[in-house]
Amino acid sequence: MQASNSFSSPDSLSTYLSEINQYPLLTQPQEQELSKRFRAGDLAAGHQLVTANLRFVVKVAYEYRSYGLKMSDLIQEANIGLMKAVQKFDPDKGIRLISYAVWWIRAYIQNCILKNWSLVKLGTTQAQRRLFFSLARTRRELEKMGAGDANVVNAEEIARKLNVKASEVREMEQRMGGRDLSLDAPMGEDGDATHLDFVESESVSAVDEVADRQQANLTRELVQRALRRLDPRERFIIEQRVMGDAEMTLSELGEHFGFSRERARQLEIRAKDKLKLALVTLMAEAGVDESTLNA
């Protein structure tokens, strides 16, 4: 089970994108059948699961184009993440492969980026690493809104969004930069079509919609399963203080159970901590990387 993606020029990337666009997408029943066959030792079924999702992998890899790595390296790591997901995917869970695989894909891409950025460029603290990834994502959002690159001119706005100092944004911006072969680049000298056009289609848009929906469904499922690990009182507190449309005040919560507002606050903190621990545990059991859930 492997996905070939050797390219180092616009033409070779174009050829690769054209090739993967030829692989048919799978319905959920087809996906489940192939997954069961692969788990039974059918490597050809695993290969079909991989190739059917390569277009989606490219679109995820493209989101990380601002980190100065070659698109070929990003796509290669993303493909490895996809293959890992195929190996661990359980078709009996009732979710689509793409919604499960996206966390593996992002995790492998991010790990590749972290390995290739020196500590001098990136910084050594966890906060600096979080800023590293958040900053690029915010830059892409600003570009989509027509605000231009997230450079020093936008430092204050970005700092407010990320809840960091503007000086930290400026420093990280200076560390970042450089792009490789872009999927936005024209395919030919006289053509307006771009490389990304090869992976932009109604079918891929449908895949994206399914992925978003399945990711939301998976998140809701994990939260509900985590809630079931709480006792009835803890569950009530979370439902009324976190998940309810009309949020109970701490005073109302204390009155409901017959204890003080301060005691209600303490129990709320305990319930939230227990829910978080249960959710992290369930994510690990499902093979979902916690750090990629908010990616």
UniProtKB/Swiss-Prot annotation:
Q: What PROSITE patterns does the record point to? A: SIGMA70_2
Cross-referenced InterPro entries, in alphabetical order? RNA_pol_sigma-70_dom, RNA_pol_sigma70, RNA_pol_sigma70_r1_2, RNA_pol_sigma70_r2, RNA_pol_sigma70_r3, RNA_pol_sigma70_r4, RNA_pol_sigma_r2, RNA_pol_sigma_r3/r4-like
- A Pfam family hit: Sigma70_r3
Q: Which family does it belong to?
A: Belongs to the sigma-70 factor family.
Keywords, comma-separated and alphabetical: DNA-binding, Sigma factor, Transcription, Transcription regulation
Annotated source species: Myxococcus xanthus
Name the UniProt record assigns to this protein: RNA polymerase sigma-C factor
- Summary of the function given for this chain in its UniProt record: Sigma factors are initiation factors that promote the attachment of RNA polymerase to specific initiation sites and are then released. This sigma factor is essential for normal fruiting body formation.
The listed location of motif Polymerase core binding is 73-86
Q: From its record, what is one biological process in GO terms?
A: DNA-templated transcription initiation
Task: Extract the GO molecular function terms from the UniProt entry.
Answer: DNA binding; sigma factor activity
Query: Has UniProt tagged this entry with the keyword Zinc?
Result: no
Q: Which residues bind DNA?
A: 250-269
